[in-house]
Design a protein with these regions (language model features):
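Hydrophobic faces of well-ordered beta-strands that scaffold small-molecule active sites
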Residues: 95-101, 125-127, 161-163, 181-183, ...
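Glycine-enriched alpha-helix->loop->beta-strand junction motifs that scaffold or abut catalytic
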Residues: 121, 173-182, 198-204, 225-231, ...
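Conserved anion-binding
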Residues: 129-133, 187-253
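Alpha-helix-loop-beta-strand connector modules within alpha/beta enzyme cores
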Residues: 139-163, 197-203, 252-266, 312-335
Length: 337
């Protein structure tokens, strides 16, 4: 349920109403907008009579919320959220550019790539230390060694680091060492992991599951937020359809849908969606045109030699060319780099 206060509602009126709701066992999420304050009410709201609140001083109107997701709901939080990733903002007018290799392989590879993507305009370094693979025989990542290499690349470049987490057991380690914790598509509904991540305050990059609906995706965001962490960034990375030419089908309509339904920022991963590096540039530009708050793109300093996903990785030169085109497009959609 949403309670919208009048613009002239006093602090005393708002505070009294919040106390009354909490006495009735409700959780109250308070959001101060430009013109008025909005109270998001969570709990067994079926036992509440909306008319009882309409007669309270300072109340403008009461609205039920039919969507199953609450904290991620734009009705609860009408203004766009901007997530601070160790100094880099995700959301708002400025585009966030995550870039780096699919997997961290060695010191030279990660530092060379990091320096080159930073020079091109990327502001967050991505790289996999733990790799969830379809085959148990495929390269699984360097794990803790890879995490240490990412930290060295961060120290060298000053870029915040983003890497994927696989297990709730790793949350404490990642909370200490990583700037943005990525939850991959396979773990979007790993509710134990999501709840554990809710105990941190680190930004969580939540990728959409292979076959997840938009509602399911936003409910997974709610798992993190309901546990106490409001810093969630959504990532559209393609969904599984009947088409087999590309790895996945990039659902750009989801960007607009999520923007309408939720206040959370949403970025796009064209690399995993296409699975083919020659598609990445056009899909990236389309994502920005569709309203994405940023991109996460795989870049490798030698794609033919990559241990993982070389076919979808751009070279540093290709990435620099892409950023130049994004820079030209950004003002048209009222964005900046």
């Amino acid at each position: 349920m949403i309670i919208i206060m009048k613009p002239q509602a006093t602090e005393e009126q708002i505070g009294s109403l919040c106390q009354d709701l909490r006495r009735q066992g409700m959780q109250v999420q308070r959001n101060a907008g430009v013109d008025c304050t909005v109270l998001g009410v969570l709990g067994d709201v079926a036992k509440l009579d909306p008319h009882d609140f309409l007669i309270q001083p300072g109340v403008e109107r009461v609205m039920p919320v039919s969507e199953p997701f609450k904290k991620a709901n734009r009705k609860f939080h009408p203004t766009d959220s901007v997530i601070d990733c160790s100094g880099v903002k995700v959301g708002g007018r400025k585009l966030a550019l995550f870039a780096g290799p699919c997997s961290v392989e060695n010191y030279d590879q990660i530092t060379d790539t990091a320096l080159k993507v930073r020079a091109s305009g990327a502001n967050i370094l991505r790289g996999g230390a733990y790799k969830p693979r379809t085959s148990p025989y495929a390269f699984q990542g360097l794990k803790l060694e890879g995490l240490a290499l990412l930290e060295q690349a961060k120290e060298l470049t000053g870029m915040p680091i983003c890497t994927e987490i696989m297990s709730p057991k790793l949350v404490e380690e990642f909370d200490r060492r990583v700037d943005v914790i990525q939850v991959g598509a396979r773990n979007m509904q790993n509710f134990d992991l999501l709840t554990e991540l809710g105990q941190t305050r680190k930004p969580i990059l939540l990728k959409r599951g292979l076959s997840a609906t938009i509602n399911e995706w936003l409910m997974s965001a709610d798992y993190i937020m309901a546990a106490g962490n409001p810093n969630v960034i959504l990532c559209e990375r393609g969904i599984r359809t009947f088409e087999t030419y590309t790895r996945n089908t990039l659902d750009l309509s989801a960007v607009q849908a999520v923007k309408r339904l939720s206040h959370l920022p949403v970025i796009v991963d064209p690399s995993h969606a296409a699975g083919l590096n020659w598609m990445v540039e056009r899909m990236s530009l389309a994502a920005i045109a569709a309203g994405a708050d940023g991109l996460i793109i795989e870049v490798h300093n030698n794609p033919p030699k990559a241990l993982c996903d070389g076919a979808q990785s751009l070279t540093p030169d290709q990435y620099a060319q892409l950023v130049g085109k994004i820079s030209a497009l950004a003002p048209i959609v009222e964005r900046t780099l």
